[in-house]
Regions:
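Conserved GNAT-fold acetyl-CoA-binding loop/helix
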Residues: 1
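Conserved beta-hairpin
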Residues: 6-23
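Conserved acyl-donor/pantetheine-binding loop and adjacent beta-alpha core of acyl/acetyltransferases
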Residues: 22-56
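Charge-biased, low-complexity intrinsically disordered regions
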Residues: 48, 86, 110-111
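Conserved acetyl-CoA-binding loop-helix of GNAT-fold acetyltransferases
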Residues: 53-70, 87-92
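Conserved GNAT acetyl-CoA-binding A-motif
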Residues: 70-82
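Conserved active-site alpha-helix within GNAT-family acetyltransferase domains
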Residues: 81-100, 104
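C-terminal "cap" of GNAT-fold acetyltransferases
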Residues: 103-116
Length: 116
């Protein structure tokens, strides 16, 4: 569905795809409720989902954020509590932990936002 809607992107290095992600304009239904915190603002934002990269490839989040910052001034993203590398990457890239959101099946995710 993300591909059909034009929201799925590939990141290339030397002509070879090394990562994929989804970036789409909010609002994100799962982000209406946030516990133990709040979003940084109520302005329009983009959401990044489903980030994946080839094994051994590092630093793609910086490239993804740089790309997305060309068309939005606010990005929201969530990640699993066990995904420590993603959390560290987000903090390093200037994201702020905002609270806990819940996905469709009720599982919790840590929510982050960066305003440029």
């Amino acid at each position: 569905r993300d591909i059909a809607q034009g929201d799925c992107y590939l990141l290339y290095e030397c002509g070879k795809p090394i990562a994929t992600f989804v970036a789409k304009a909010g609002p994100e239904p799962n982000y209406h409720r946030i516990d133990n915190g709040s979003w940084l603002d109520d302005q329009p934002y983009y959401v990044i989902h489903r980030v994946a990269s080839l094994e051994g490839v590092h630093g793609v989040m910086a490239d993804i954020i740089n790309y997305c910052s060309a068309f939005t001034s606010s990005i929201r993203i969530d990640t699993h509590a066990d995904n420590r590398p993603m959390q560290a990457s987000l903090i390093r890239l200037g994201f702020v932990y905002c609270g806990i959101i819940y996905v469709e099946n009720g599982d919790s995710r840590l929510a982050f936002q960066r305003v440029f």
